[in-house]
Amino acid sequence: MFKRALCLIAFTACVAMLISPMNAGGDKKGKGKDDPKYNNPTFVPTADEVIEKMFEMGKVGKNDLIFDLGCGDNRICFMAAKKFGSRGVGIETNPVRIREAMDMFDKYNKNDAISYGTEVKLPLVETRHGDALAMKDLGDATVVVMYMFPEFMTYWQPIAAKHLKPGTRILSHDYEWDYSALPNAWKPAATATVKSSSRDNHKVIMWVVPEKNK
């Protein structure tokens, strides 16, 4: 009886570890929660009111290609495709979120959706299972959106500076990179505070990539 109790406790502990928030955003390359670049474990959807403010600030339109880093269910790209006809690429490490992105096809009534493996594609929207720090086509983006912690953003900013085209708009929900660690990092072009049904003080920050010699 005592051995059975110990086994039950051990099994319960293992299940708790698997479903805990700290494991919800595990990176497929094995980088764990101790790596600050990947310490963005919990998915919190961006409120629709915040997304609309991002679209407004970034002047998103039909000719834009939006990259959403840590896209979750990829709702931002789907909303932009439906509202503006713009293209979108979402990238996400968590396969659970990838499955939720597949479910988004039904919500947006896309009958021509194609799904295969860990990727899902539409004519306008693509969802990738991968590493947001290793996107080889980042330079194709005209708009980049994210809801990531400052540690990730601080690591990503020099990558963005190397690859993004001048004029690309970067829009972040709540967080900014660490300016003390990046003295030459771009400063915000605009900020706004947004109220939603869950919070009164969402922050939206926008940067615009300058010419390379500035």
Model-found features: residue ranges?
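C-terminal substrate-binding/active-site "lid" region of AdoMet-derived donor-dependent transferases
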Residues: E151-K214
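N-terminal export/membrane-targeting signals
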Residues: M1-G25
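A short SAM/SAH-binding and catalytic strip from SAM-dependent methyltransferases
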Residues: L138-Y155
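S-adenosyl-L-methionine
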Residues: A5, M22-D64, I98-D140
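Conserved class I S-adenosyl-L-methionine
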Residues: N63-G72
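Conserved SAM-binding motif I beta-strand of class I
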Residues: R87-E92
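Glycine-rich SAM-binding Motif I of class I
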Residues: N74-F78
